[in-house]
From Swiss-Prot:
Catalytic activity: a ribonucleoside 5'-triphosphate + H2O = a ribonucleoside 5'-phosphate + diphosphate + H(+); a 2'-deoxyribonucleoside 5'-triphosphate + H2O = a 2'-deoxyribonucleoside 5'-phosphate + diphosphate + H(+)
Natural source organism: Rhodospirillum rubrum (strain ATCC 11170 / ATH 1.1.1 / DSM 467 / LMG 4362 / NCIMB 8255 / S1)
Protein name: Nucleoside triphosphate pyrophosphatase
Family of this protein: Belongs to the Maf family.
Residues at the catalytic site: D79
Length: 202
């Protein structure tokens, strides 16, 4: 890569976001963002910030520390919040909470507020918000218990308690939105942003 092309850093511990960038051929280095995500979310909720704005703020905060530590780098931050009505659904953290979330979402449509933000030298250069609409089918209690048993602890770190690229697909009757955004990264708009910076060929 030319010395004139800025390095790309992904401020995320998410395997899904890293996998999407790798599969798209984006040269990048991943690093943990080093922020207290739950404390930031609690503060934003207390301030009455909407889920869509919170996703953008969280993506930016995740990228900021790395951006200040790596001058000239393009630092990508992202966040995803499942929202239904005015309620945010945080990552469940346990299978018991995952069950509660899925019972709430069953037979209803929720939105995945999915933000990606790019910073350089601590300043936001660009952001994009995707809002996939996810309609869960009215699955049976037996299906729910089988799903929780088979999906296991991995879903406790996922917004909405599912991974669409796996068993979670069986939860849904309909989706509106691209699969990249549903998996946590609005990839096509991000690639469009990176091209003029020389990271990818136009």
């Amino acid at each position: 890569m030319s010395a004139l092309v800025p390095p790309v850093l992904l401020a995320s511990s998410s395997p899904s976001r890293g996998r999407l960038l790798s599969e798209a051929g984006v040269p990048f280095t991943a690093a943990a963002p080093g922020v207290d995500e739950q404390a930031i979310k609690a503060s934003l909720k207390a301030e009455g910030v909407s889920a869509r704005d919170a996703a953008i703020h969280l993506g930016e905060w995740k990228a900021r520390r790395l951006s200040l530590a790596h001058p000239q780098a393009l630092v990508i931050g992202g966040d995803q919040i499942a929202a239904i009505d005015d309620l945010w659904l945080d990552k469940p953290g346990s299978l018991a909470t995952a069950r509660q979330h899925l019972l709430l979402l069953r037979g209803r449509t929720h939105v995945l507020e999915t933000a990606v933000v790019v910073l350089r030298d601590g300043q936001r250069l660009w952001h994009h918000l995707a809002r996939p609409k996810m309609t869960m089918r009215s699955f049976s209690d037996a299906f729910l218990e089988d799903y929780l048993d088979r999906a296991g602890a991995g879903i406790t770190a996922c917004a909405g308690a599912y991974q669409i690229e796996g068993l979670g697909l069986q939860l849904f009757a309909a989706i509106e939105g691209d699969l990249f955004s549903i998996q946590g990264l609005p990839l096509l708009p991000l690639l469009d942003f990176l091209r003029p910076h020389g990271v990818l060929l136009s």
